[in-house]
Swiss-Prot record:
Protein purpose: ssDNA-binding protein that contributes to the ionizing radiation resistance of D.deserti. Plays a role in DNA repair and genome reconstitution, in a RecA-independent process, since DdrA is essential for recovery from severe genomic fragmentation as a result of exposure to severe levels of ionizing radiation in an environment lacking nutrients. In vitro, binds to the 3'-ends of single-stranded DNA, and probably protects them from nuclease degradation. Thus, DdrA is part of a DNA end-protection system that helps to preserve genome integrity following irradiation or desiccation.
Keywords (A to Z) from UniProt: DNA damage, DNA repair, DNA-binding, Stress response
Protein known as: Single-stranded DNA-binding protein DdrA
Upregulating conditions: Induced to high levels following extreme ionizing radiation exposure. Also highly induced in response to desiccation stress.
Complexes and interactors: The truncated form (1-160) of DdrA forms heptameric rings that can assemble into a 3-ring structure.
Domain-level remarks: The N-terminal domain (1-160) is sufficient to pilot the oligomerization process and to bind specifically single-stranded DNA, but is not functional in vivo.
Similarity comment: Belongs to the RAD52 family.
Encoding gene, per UniProt annotation: ddrA
MF terms (GO), sorted A to Z: DNA binding
């Protein structure tokens, strides 16, 4: 088994309940916040265990002389290694363990795990500053959900977006394929009446 054989499974969206949200920016009046989606290091480990349980490893090396606990992580999946730096947050959570978790998530993104979260649209929501949480959590768009959580048209929309991710295909048949999926997605939202239904008698 090669990395290319499991790439799509590694890159697959996580269930909505596994995606957490944290404020990236809060307005001066503390009434609204720009929410950022993220996953836990355990989600990364679970994904790796599900896809290639005996073919991945993670190593960390402490980076000396930094203000916050910092490590260099190396994630190896099916013989391919990716490295990145992990840094612990400020405050009580600033531990080497937190830095290692950060490094694991950053390395995992290089394999496509959770990378789609960086493509989410900006989501500003009402912010409850007393509770330090959003009044209502943001909603994930259709394409950022696993198949079983999508609406009937969601799968078609994802197919079209996959083909348009980099550029509009020049091949006429591929253009027709994109159009077919977009039409099916829109049709699921606004079903087209069949036959003479809706016509004047």
């Amino acid at each position: 088994m090669k990395l290319s054989d499991v790439q799509k499974r590694l890159q697959a969206p996580f269930p909505a309940h596994a995606v957490a949200w944290k404020p990236g920016v809060i307005t001066k009046d503390r009434s609204r916040a720009l929410m950022l989606a993220h996953i836990d290091a355990r989600n990364v480990q679970d994904r790796l265990d599900a896809v290639c349980p005996d073919a991945w490893s993670f190593e960390v090396e402490v980076v000396p002389g930094t203000r916050l606990p910092t490590v260099k992580g190396r994630l190896t999946v099916l013989g391919v290694s990716r490295e990145d730096i992990g840094e612990a947050p400020e405050g009580d959570l600033g531990t080497l363990k937190a830095a290692a978790s950060d490094a694991l998530k950053r390395c995992a993104v290089q394999f496509g795990i959770g990378r789609y979260l960086y493509d989410l649209p900006k989501q500003w929501v009402a912010w409850n500053d007393a509770k330090r949480e959003p009044v209502s959590p943001p909603e994930l768009p259709e394409w950022a959900r696993p198949d079983h959580e999508r609406s009937p048209g969601g799968a078609h929309l994802v197919q079209a977006m996959d083909q348009l991710r980099y550029e509009m295909p020049e091949d006429l048949e591929l253009q027709r394929e994109v159009y077919k999926h977009l039409k099916a997605a829109l049709g699921s939202l606004h079903p087209i009446s069949g036959g003479n239904q809706g016509r004047a008698a």
